[in-house]
A protein has these predicted regions:
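N-terminal Sec-pathway targeting helices
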Residues: 1-9
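A structural signal for short, hydrophobic/glycine-enriched beta-strand patches
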Residues: 11-168
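A transmembrane-helix-recognition feature enriched in membrane-embedded lipid enzymes
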Residues: 168-190
Length: 190
C-alpha cells in the first residue's frame, strides 16, 4: 500500500505540468471566428481584451455589429460606458458597437437579461467573445438558455491566464480556481 502511494505521488510530481495544463485546457473551449449576425462581448474584462477581440471580428468582416454587455458598476457607470470608448481610442469606429446596459451580476443573469434583446433584434447566429478561461462555461450557459440560436465562442486572450502555465502566476491561479468553482456550481445547477 505504501509503495502504491509512493508511486502515485511520484507520478503526480513527474506529470504535474500535464495534469495542471489539462485542467486549465478544459476551461478553454472556443473555435476560430465564423460569420454571424453579431458578436456579443460578455462583461467582466477590465483590460479591454474582449472588446478589442470583438471589434477586430467586425473589422475583419465576420460580424456587422458588436453588442457590448454593460452591467452597472463603479461610480454609476455601466461597463459599456468604459469599453466602447476604449475600443474607439484603439482605432475602431463607434458605429460598430451597440450598448446592452443591464444589471447582471453573473454569466447566467447576463444571459437572461440579454437574450430577449438579442432575439428581438432578429439575431440567429451569435459569436460570444469572452476571456479564454471563461469560454467553456459561458458557451454552455448561452447554449442551454438559447437552444434556438446558433452560439459560437471566440476566446479573447487573458493577460494572466494561459492553459499551460497558469500555475506560475498568482493572478492566473486565482482565475483558475474561481473559474473551476463556477464551473462546478454550474454543473450542479447553482
Amino acid at each position: 500500500m505504501l509503495l502504491l502511494a509512493g508511486l502515485a505521488l511520484l507520478a503526480v510530481a513527474v506529470l504535474h505540468a500535464q495534469i495542471l495544463g489539462g485542467l486549465g485546457a478544459y476551461l478553454v473551449q472556443a473555435g476560430p471566428p465564423q460569420t454571424a449576425d453579431a458578436a456579443l462581448v460578455l462583461a467582466g474584462d477590465g483590460w479591454g481584451h474582449r472588446i478589442l477581440t470583438a471589434a477586430q471580428l467586425a473589422r475583419d468582416g465576420f460580424v456587422p455589429k458588436v453588442l457590448v454587455s454593460g452591467p452597472d458598476g463603479a461610480y454609476g457607470l455601466h461597463e459599456s460606458d468604459l469599453a466602447i470608448p476604449f475600443a474607439v481610442k484603439h482605432g475602431y469606429p463607434e458605429s460598430y458597437f451597440v450598448r446592452l446596459d443591464n444589471s447582471a451580476r453573473s454569466t447566467v443573469t447576463e444571459a437572461q437579461a440579454i437574450l430577449p434583446v438579442i432575439r428581438g433584434m432578429g439575431i440567429h447566429r451569435l459569436v460570444l467573445v469572452t476571456s479564454n478561461f471563461h469560454t467553456r462555461r459561458a458557451g454552455a450557459i448561452y447554449r442551454r438558455l438559447a437552444p434556438d440560436l446558433t452560439i459560437m465562442v471566440v476566446a479573447a486572450p487573458d493577460q494572466n491566464f494561459t492553459a499551460n502555465g497558469w500555475w506560475h502566476n498568482r493572478e492566473a491561479q486565482k482565475t483558475f480556481l474561481m473559474e473551476w468553482e463556477k464551473t462546478v456550481a454550474n454543473w450542479m445547477g447553482l
